[in-house]
Amino acid sequence: MLRFDGLAASRAAVADMMDSLRHRGPDSDGLHVDGPAGLGHLRLKIIDLSPAAAQPMTNEDGSLWITFNGEIYNYRSLRATLMGAGHPFRSASDTEAILHLYEEVGDRVVEELDGMFAFALWDRRRERMLLARDRVGKKPLYYHKDDRRLLFGSEPKALLRHPGLAPEVDDRGVAAYFTYGYAPAPRSLYRDVEVVPPGHVVSYSVDGNEERRRYWDLRFPDAADVGRPDERSAEARVRALLTEAVKKRLVADVPLGAFLSGGVDSSIVVGLMSQLTSEPVRTFSIGFAGDPAFDETRYARMVSE
């Protein structure tokens, strides 16, 4: 939350918004209010299970606060670089790497992150709230802005818990959902609730001024510049990319598993996981009893065994 009217953020309002999202973070919770800014976090522990990694998290002097959802796959290399530049770390979390990286490069922090993420970062010195979302929008981030306040959260229900926002359906958002299977950003299913688009940062100052920037877009090179690789080279390239993608996602301080449908995609992922780890891979599957046309559990069982 960020107030534009000179009033302090309401701790009770932030806490009420958090209560609607407790299913997302069962391990711990935290809340911080700093004048017009209020941040809440419900944590699902993945990296650094200690209290040192609790959120909202701040830097050394309390001038920056962040609530972050996701995983940063290159946080170890970022951490090493930042420590070499003199930044002290109090945790082993990827969250803290974002804070110190922001101290170094400001808004360009998102361009250095390899991962899936959505975060809100309060910069007290600049009196500004920064909302950011990963390149393809794997992690959600909804927000509402009016003349008095900015509200944001991982699900619309958090925003709708605030008494200043009425739950009204957006007809265009619903029409888009039934047309495409989702409501394209920045539209949502609710009126006056928007989505931070993938690959974007949106910031608001305490006077309500908005700045919006696209930091990444999917660009396809011309076919003439790429050429036509032979089948063996293409296969090797795809295998290398998939292996690296799976490998970077195996960094965790908790046991890992995979949803195994029995289809090609999940079977490849589980196969690569088994090659990259020494421990047996835990898999989970869902079947369709009595409907053999859609039931692939037999294939899932073959892969898991």
Model-derived features: where do they sit?
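Cysteine-centered catalytic environments shared across enzyme families
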Residues: 1-305
